[in-house]
């Protein structure tokens, strides 16, 4: 009986793919060695301990319909599009060894004619006249009896978009999260014009089989049919939830300030697990009462644009004379935290 398992996802949904990964990892026998191949459409994937408001340009992501996905491993933020091929290697302990999976990926690249080396913070790089260029980044997760190594290979990623979404707005965040290390990157198409996702998957698969001396048929995982994986529906619901993707952010503080025709406003927020634990409002407005009331309304709210906007709008009935000011304030707050 083979100890290998090969899974290939035909979904581009990051929440679906990460839920599949999590379910397989939790329920796999300790004797099994798994390779999961997948890719995501337009997504910023952040590490388990990262703050999305600090790492990402969340406003531009929303405007461009780019999803946010928090993974269960550590490390930094990355942008995925269909120009990336994602891989996950899983194994039980004591056999789990990230150097083995790194060797497999390097062997796959070598078979395609790309000589790469492992470097620094879990990267694979190629040497160019301009210096080392990163073609792959990885992250890892271990539990008591198993571990996984997952990462991406840059095939034909839109590197300009990567810079757009991973360069955060200059918000005044005093955050305790982990800031990603920006690296010089290169696409494999610069080295192998015309290389495809399917060719890379085939190369990684063959290197996986060669290392273990076994072969196995691929299992195609599709969202058109709910995967036969224990607790998949619950895992997908969690992976796609605001509470997981945003609410798991480390505690941080945010200062917003703006000058309106009717006065200046300064908002101070303390946020924990995506919820405002303290809100202070300062203003030189001649009618400060609605803003003073707003501070109380905001405490306990989720740090979401729509929620903050609703909290501000809810004061209109109480302060109808300041309707215009409150609507202006609501629109500004919603835009500022996106």
Curated annotation (Swiss-Prot):
Gene name tied to this protein: lplA
UniProt keyword Ligase present: yes
SUPFAM superfamilies with a match to the protein in the record: Class II aaRS and biotin synthetases (SSF55681), SufE/NifU (SSF82649)
Binding-site list for ATP: 71, 76-79, 134
PANTHER family assigned to the protein according to its UniProt record, in alphabetical order: LIPOATE-PROTEIN LIGASE, LIPOYLTRANSFERASE 1, MITOCHONDRIAL
An annotated Gene Ontology molecular function: ATP binding
E.C. code: 6.3.1.20
Miscellaneous field: In the transfer reaction, the free carboxyl group of lipoic acid is attached via an amide linkage to the epsilon-amino group of a specific lysine residue of lipoyl domains of lipoate-dependent enzymes.
UniProt cross-references to PROSITE patterns, sorted A to Z: BPL_LPL_CATALYTIC
Residues in BPL/LPL catalytic domain copies: 29-216
Catalysis: reaction(s): L-lysyl-[lipoyl-carrier protein] + (R)-lipoate + ATP = N(6)-[(R)-lipoyl]-L-lysyl-[lipoyl-carrier protein] + AMP + diphosphate + H(+)
Binding positions ((R)-lipoate): 134
The protein's role, per its UniProt record: Catalyzes both the ATP-dependent activation of exogenously supplied lipoate to lipoyl-AMP and the transfer of the activated lipoyl onto the lipoyl domains of lipoate-dependent enzymes.
Localization in the cell: Cytoplasm
Keywords: ATP-binding, Cytoplasm, Ligase, Nucleotide-binding
CDD domains with a match to the protein in the record: LplA
UniProt similarity note: Belongs to the LplA family.
Principal subcellular localisation of the protein: cytoplasm
Gene Ontology CC annotation, any one: cytosol
Keyword flag Ribonucleoprotein: no
Name of the protein described by the UniProt record: Lipoate-protein ligase A
Root EC class: ligase
One GO biological process term: protein modification process
Oligomer status and interactors: Monomer.
Pathway: Protein modification; protein lipoylation via exogenous pathway; protein N(6)-(lipoyl)lysine from lipoate: step 1/2; Protein modification; protein lipoylation via exogenous pathway; protein N(6)-(lipoyl)lysine from lipoate: step 2/2
């Amino acid at each position: 009986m083979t100890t290998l398992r090969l899974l290939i996802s035909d979904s581009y949904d990051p929440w679906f793919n990460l839920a599949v990964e999590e379910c397989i990892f939790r329920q796999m026998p300790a004797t099994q060695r798994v390779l999961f191949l997948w890719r995501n459409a337009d997504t910023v994937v952040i590490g388990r301990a990262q703050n999305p408001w600090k790492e990402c340009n969340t406003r531009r992501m929303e405007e461009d319909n780019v999803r946010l996905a928090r993974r269960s491993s550590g490390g930094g933020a990355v942008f995925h599009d269909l120009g990336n091929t994602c891989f996950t290697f899983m194994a039980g302990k004591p056999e789990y060894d990230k150097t083995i999976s790194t060797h497999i990926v390097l062997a796959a690249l070598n078979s395609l004619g790309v000589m790469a080396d492992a470097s620094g913070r879990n990267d694979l790089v190629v040497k160019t006249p301009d210096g080392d260029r990163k073609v792959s980044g990885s992250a890892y997760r271990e539990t008591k009896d198993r571990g996984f190594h997952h990462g991406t290979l840059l095939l034909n990623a839109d590197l300009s978009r990567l810079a757009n979404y991973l360069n955060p707005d200059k918000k005044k965040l005093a955050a305790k999260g982990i800031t990603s290390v920006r690296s010089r990157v290169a696409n494999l198409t610069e080295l192998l014009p015309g290389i495809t996702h399917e060719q890379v998957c085939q190369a990684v698969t063959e290197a996986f089989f060669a290392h273990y001396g076994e072969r196995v048929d691929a299992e195609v995982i599709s969202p058109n049919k709910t995967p036969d994986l224990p607790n998949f529906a619950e895992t997908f619901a969690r992976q796609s939830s605001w509470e997981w993707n945003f609410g798991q952010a480390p505690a941080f503080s945010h200062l917003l300030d703006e000058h309106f025709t009717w006065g200046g406003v300064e908002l101070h927020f303390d946020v924990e697990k995506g919820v405002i634990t303290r809100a202070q409002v300062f203003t030189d407005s001649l009618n400060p009462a609605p803003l003073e009331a707003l501070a109380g309304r905001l405490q306990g709210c989720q740090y979401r644009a729509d929620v903050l906007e609703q909290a501000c709008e809810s004061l209109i009935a109480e302060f109808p004379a300041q309707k215009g000011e409150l609507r202006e304030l609501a629109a500004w707050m919603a835009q500022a935290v996106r």
